[in-house]
Amino acid sequence: MDKTQPHPLFKLATELGPLIVFFFVNAKFNLFAATGAFMVAIIAALIASYVVTRHIPLMALVTAVVVIVFGTLTLVLHDETFIKVKPTIIYGLFAAVLGGGLVFNRSFIAIMFDQMFNLTPAGWRILTFRWALFFAGMAVLNEIIWRTQSTDFWVGFKAFGVLPLTMIFAIAQMPLIKRYHQDPASLEASDAAEGDVSKG
């Protein structure tokens, strides 16, 4: 089934909306109420994404599953540790998948950026390595913040710090993308010579 490309504002709303809900419910009530609201908002965002685009991004689906699992543990056991460690699990998982893919000469970042860029195999490898390092760094940063700062500070960082950091990192990759960008005809020749790392 063909995927409909969503409007950038819609994509931003489905990604940032649940975090904003999480932040404001935590400010108004507490972390446990915010966790429940976050779970509902995540599910609503997935449904909206599928209704509009007939497609659910892999990263969004993985994130939602982890949120629901750790959110449920948080509420059932009434222990905020689970929801706080959730980002560490997600970032660590992404870093492991991307890094592990490189070991087997597969660039899974090419799947994440499907149809957005046409890069040479070398370009995909470098970009994948950088994103693996970024996710690993974010996992470490989340651990440091939730273990050393207040819950409100952690919630604020999660809601309003993670996205800017991700955007800054993504923008910083543009020189690499421009350097290794190729038109489709040249890319086919390059893939034949080096092997398409996105497909193994």
Swiss-Prot record:
The lineage of its organism: Bacteria, Pseudomonadati, Pseudomonadota, Alphaproteobacteria, Hyphomicrobiales. The gene is yciB. It comes from the Bacteria. InterPro entries: YciB. The chain crosses the membrane at residues 7-27, 32-52, 56-76, 93-113, 126-146, 153-173. Plays a role in cell envelope biogenesis, maintenance of cell envelope integrity and membrane homeostasis. It is a multi-pass membrane protein. This is Inner membrane-spanning protein YciB. Keywords: Cell inner membrane, Cell membrane, Membrane, Transmembrane, Transmembrane helix. Disulfide bonds: none annotated. HAMAP family: YciB. Belongs to the YciB family. GO terms for cellular component: plasma membrane. It holds the Pfam family IspA. It comes from Bradyrhizobium sp. (strain ORS 278). It is found in: Cell inner membrane.
